[in-house]
Structures are given as structure tokens and as C-alpha cells.
Amino acid sequence: MERHMVRGQLYKHFDLERKNAKQAEARLDQRLQRLKVICLYHVKLLTWEQRQLQKELQRLQQAETMKKKFSSYLGNGFQKRPEDVLVFSPQGRQKHRAPQAKKMRALATRMAQDTCKSKSQVPPSHDAGLKDPMKSKKQPLSQNNRTACFIKEQPQAQEKDSVNPSKDVDPSKGISVPCQNQEVSTNTIEQGPSSSPASDSGMACADETRSKDVALKPDGNTGKQIPPKHMECAGSFEGEFTKPTFLELLSKARNAHYLRHRVPPESERLLSIGEIFGHGESSSSRAGKECENRVPSKFLPL
């Protein structure tokens, strides 16, 4: 009986050991599986990182090759361009490709030469829109041209007046004095007292230049030029090919003769002391003073 008891205990002990061994094996299997999963995960991660590194490597290599090509292209000083390179056909024939820039330059030079030749061959054409000078004689001159011409003809008129004195002549001075009712001829423009001498002289210079341009242009229909009577209105601008400077125009404007009124207005008449304080004066003395004030010094004959 004791043997059976001892064997039974031994069997139980062996069974427990077997169970423990089996449980340990199962645990080891589970741990192994976990380790395998972790290994697979790490392997996949490493492969992905390797692919990314390979892609970055390829990009860096391409960038280096492009930099080398660009540096060599710049180092040559743009002597060899991709357009100038020879292109070989599959049959083995060589075809030269001319650069587009050279073509454009050649076309531009040819066009410029053609235009220069055409301009040299064609004679200078005159404007056909100008009016006939004979017709322009019939039409009255403009006010600006009248003032310019009158400025030129003014000394001649004064000389005629000095040679042929009118009824109102001062015998002591030999100067023709206009009466109170007399005025400038209709060919001149009456300007108010507000007009300044600088503006009048500037207008006279501008009118002289315009009259010169109109006189020098020939007519397209008849081929005749404007008579020399109108050419005299050009004044000192005749024979000048360059535009005058501002200082020259200013000096001419200062030296230019201008007309306001042969008879100054009543508002500009100089009053005597007697007239200011209300004392009357004789009409004869007053008329003599008015005649003296009305004749400016610049209109006296030389």
C-alpha cells in the first residue's frame, strides 16, 4: 500500500511539472510571436526609410549634375548655345540650326536698309493742303499777322508822316500830332490798358515765326511761293535754321516795338494840380498838355 501511495504522489508531481512545462512553452511561443511581429515592423520601417533615402540621393545627384552643366555653360561665356549645336539626323546627315536671335537681327538690319533706300529715292513731297497764294491775297490777314506786319511797317509810315505833315503839325518840332478823335488804322488791334508790354512783344514774336513758316511753304497746286511782301513780316527770323533760345527771344521782345493807343485813354491822363484841387484851367493849355502826353517818345521819327 505504501508503494502505491508513493507512486501516486510521484505521478501527481510529474503531472504538475508537465503542466508547468507546457504553460512555459506556450508563454515562450507567445513571446516569440510578439518578437517576430516587432521584427517585421522594424524591417518594414527600415525598408521605407531606405526608399526615402534613395529618392533623396537621386534628387541630390540630379541637382549636382544640373549645377555642373550650368557652371560649365556659364564658364564658356555663352559661346556655345543650345541653338548653335549641330543636330544629327537618324540618316547620319548634319543640319545646322541658325539661332533665332541672328535671324531677327538680320531681318531688322535689312528692313532698316530698305527704309533708308526708299526715303533717299522718294523726293520730298510738299503739303497739298495749302491754299493758293493768289486766293490768300483776297482773304484778309488774321489779327496776329496784321500786328506783326504793322510793327515792321511802322517806321516807314512815320517817315512818310514826317515828310508829308498833316493839318495838325507842330511847326516848332516838326512832328505830326494826332487829334483827340483820331485813332490807329483798322489794320491794328486796339488793346486795353491792362495788356502788358511783355505779353504784346511775345505775341509779336510768335506772329513773326508763324508768318515766316506760311511764307516759306510753297503751294502744292501752283508751286509758287508767297510774295515777298509777306516775307518781310518774318523780320529777323529770316535765314535762321535753329530754334532761338529763351534769352534771344527775351532780348528781341525787349527791343520789339509795340502799339497800345496813339491816344491814351482818359483814365491814364496826367492831372494837373489845379484839376486835382478843382481850379479850372484854360482849354487851350489843357489841349496842349494832352497833345504832349499823347505822343510817346518811342514813336518819334529818327
UniProtKB/Swiss-Prot annotation:
The keyword Coiled coil applies. Residues 14-72 form a coiled coil. This is Coiled-coil domain-containing protein 190. InterPro entries: CC190. The gene is CCDC190. Keywords: Coiled coil. It comes from Homo sapiens (Human). Residues 110-229, 278-302 are annotated as: Disordered. Residues 178-199 have a biased composition (Polar residues). Residues 158-171, 207-216 have a biased composition (Basic and acidic residues). The keyword Nuclease does not apply. Pfam families: CC190 (PF15768).
